[in-house]
Amino acid sequence: MKKKILLLSLLFQSLMYSQQDAWIYLTDKENVAASISNPITILTQKAIDRKNAQGIAIDVRDVPVTESYITQLKAQTGITVLAKSKWFNAVHVRGSEVDINALSVLSFVDYIDFADKSLNTGRPSVQQSKFD
């Protein structure tokens, strides 16, 4: 009897805490041209000086992720925003598989990439580089 209770509790616990991690890739960024033409609004002077010293141009990767997109993701039921990447224009989230998949209907979501690769369905087979 003890073994059955232990087995059931372990099964229930794994179902209860089945949180998934995923990167939500976004379609675009707001005010890209304005941000690039006035880089001090998105980068510190020290960062601008470092890029200039290395001969690295300021581009779309330096523009932050659109804050209204992050706010909308945070407002979704069962979703916790853990991190954001301006280089990839993506947000790292945690939630149930169902809650994360529900984000795909948002107009600004390009695709979803689960940490558990077996959950990745519907992702385009060929991705265009965001840096071209």
Task: Tell me what each language-model feature is.
Residues 128-132:
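Short, intrinsically disordered, charge-balanced linker/junction segments flanking boundaries
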Residues 1-24:
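Bacterial Sec-dependent N-terminal signal peptides
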Residues 19-127:
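Inhibitory N-terminal propeptides of secreted protease zymogens
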